[in-house]
Regions:
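Local sequence-structure signature of Cys/Sec-based thiol-disulfide redox active-site neighborhoods
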Residues: 27-67
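Bacterial Sec-dependent N-terminal signal peptides
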Residues: 1-24
C-alpha cells in the first residue's frame, strides 16, 4: 500500500514538473547575456514585450509552457526578456531594434549582431519553426545583407534580404532605394520586381515611390489593379499615421499633400478622416467643418459613427444655418444607418438648435424609444422633449 502511495506521489510530482516547465528566462541584462553568448556560443533570444500586451501574455501563459517550445529554446538560446513599459529600457532599446509592436523576439550573437528578428503572437509549432530558421546562417540578417551588398542589382539577393528584414518589421526603404539605384533607376515590370517594391517601399516622398506611381499601369499588368492600389493606400496610411497621432502638423500636411497627388478615392477617403482628426485635435473648427462639408457625403456616407461625430462637432461649433442643416443631414443619415439612441439624439439636438421643432421632437422620441430598449439613460432626449412642450 505504501509503495502504491509513493508511486502515486511520484507520478503527481513528475506531472506537476512537466506542466510547470517553461522557457527559462535568465535574470540578465542584454549586455551581460551577450557576454555570456560570447563565452558559450549560444545566441541570445531577447524578448521585448509589454506587461499590458495581451499577445505577450498569451505567449507567456500558453505557448512558452509547451514542452516542445521550452525544450528547444532552453537548449539553444540564452533567453532574456525586458518589459518595454519600463521607460528607461524603452528609451534604450526601441530605437536600436526598431521596435514597433510587441512581442518582438530578437536573436543576437556574442558579437552583439542581430541575426534574426520576428514579431507577434505564434502557435507553438510556428514559434519553434522561427527559432530553427534563426539558427540557420542562410536565413540570418548578416548573411543576406552581405549577399545583397555584394550584388545590389540582383533581384534574388534583394528579395532574400528584404524577407529577413520584413520578419522583424525592420527598415526596408534604404534597401529598395539601393536596388533601384543599382539598376540605373529603370526596373523591369516583372512579378519579382513588384514583389520587391511592394514589401520595401514606405516613403511617399521618395524617388522610387514616384517611379511606382508613374508606372502604375505597367505594374498592374504583372500584379493587379487591386494589389497596386492597396500598396499605394498602405504607404499613404503609414506616412500619415505617425504625424497625425503625434500632432506633428508640419509633417502631416507635407505627407498629406503628397498622398493627395496619388489620386485614388481610397486614399482621398483616408485623407478626409485623418484631416478631421487633426483639425479636431487642434480645434481648427472652420477647417474641420469645411472638410466635412466637402467630403463626408462622398467618402463617409455609409459610416454611421463618423457622420454622427461630424454632426456633433457642427452642432457645438457652428451657428451658420446652412452648415447646421448640413450637419442635420449627417445626423439623420447616421440614424438611418444605425437607429440607435445617440444617433437619433444628434439629429434631435441639431434640429432643436435650428428651431425645427417638429423634427427635433421626432428624433428625440425615436432616441428615447431606442434608449429604453437597452435600458439607457435618456435624460438628454427627455430634456429636449420637455423644452418642446412634451
Amino acid at each position: 500500500m505504501f509503495r502504491n502511495i509513493t508511486l502515486l506521489l511520484t507520478f503527481f510530482a513528475l506531472t506537476s514538473s512537466l506542466f510547470a516547465q517553461s522557457i527559462n528566462f535568465q535574470p540578465l541584462s542584454l549586455e551581460d547575456a551577450i557576454i555570456e553568448s560570447g563565452k558559450t556560443g549560444k545566441p541570445v533570444m531577447f524578448m521585448a514585450y509589454q506587461s499590458t500586451c495581451t499577445h505577450c501574455e498569451k505567449m507567456i501563459n500558453e505557448v512558452f509552457p509547451d514542452t516542445m517550445v521550452s525544450n528547444f529554446y532552453n537548449a539553444n538560446f540564452i533567453n532574456i526578456r525586458i518589459d518595454m513599459l519600463d521607460q528607461v529600457m524603452a528609451k534604450k532599446y526601441i530605437q536600436q531594434f526598431y521596435l514597433s509592436s510587441f512581442p518582438t523576439f530578437i536573436i543576437i550573437n556574442g558579437k552583439a549582431e542581430t541575426l534574426y528578428q520576428y514579431v507577434g503572437e505564434f502557435k507553438a509549432a510556428e514559434f519553434v519553426k522561427q527559432a530553427k530558421l534563426s539558427l540557420d546562417p542562410a536565413n540570418q540578417i548578416p548573411t543576406n545583407r552581405r549577399a545583397f551588398e555584394a550584388n545590389p542589382a540582383d533581384s534574388t539577393a534583394c528579395y532574400n534580404y528584404l524577407l529577413t528584414l520584413s520578419r522583424g518589421r525592420l527598415a526596408t526603404q534604404s534597401v529598395a532605394s539601393a536596388y533601384f539605384n543599382a539598376n540605373n533607376k529603370q526596373l523591369e515590370f516583372t512579378t519579382s520586381n513588384w514583389r520587391i517594391l511592394s514589401m520595401s517601399v514606405s516613403n511617399l516622398d521618395s524617388e522610387i515611390f514616384r517611379y511606382m506611381l508613374e508606372h502604375k499601369a505597367d505594374f498592374e499588368k504583372v500584379a493587379s489593379t487591386k494589389k497596386v492600389e492597396r500598396k499605394f493606400y498602405l504607404t499613404a496610411a503609414y506616412n500619415l499615421q505617425t504625424p497625425a497621432t503625434t500632432n506633428d502638423t508640419t509633417n502631416y500636411f507635407r505627407y498629406r499633400n503628397l498622398a493627395a497627388k496619388v489620386g485614388l478615392p481610397i486614399i482621398d477617403s483616408l485623407i478626409l478622416v485623418t484631416d478631421l482628426s487633426v483639425y479636431e485635435k487642434n480645434k481648427q473648427w472652420d477647417a474641420y467643418i469645411q472638410a466635412a462639408k466637402s467630403g463626408a457625403e462622398k467618402y463617409l456616407w455609409n459610416d454611421a459613427n463618423s457622420l454622427r461625430r461630424i454632426s456633433d462637432m457642427i452642432y457645438e461649433h457652428s451657428s451658420d444655418k446652412s452648415t447646421l442643416v448640413k450637419g442635420a443631414n449627417f445626423a439623420v443619415r447616421s440614424a438611418e444607418l444605425k437607429p440607435e439612441y445617440f444617433n437619433n439624439l444628434s439629429a434631435a439636438k441639431i434640429y432643436f438648435k435650428l428651431g425645427y421643432n417638429d423634427l427635433s421632437k421626432k428624433y428625440a422620441q425615436q432616441a428615447i424609444a431606442e434608449g429604453k430598449k437597452k435600458n439607457m439613460n435618456t435624460v438628454e432626449a427627455n430634456k429636449i422633449l420637455e423644452e418642446l412642450g412634451g
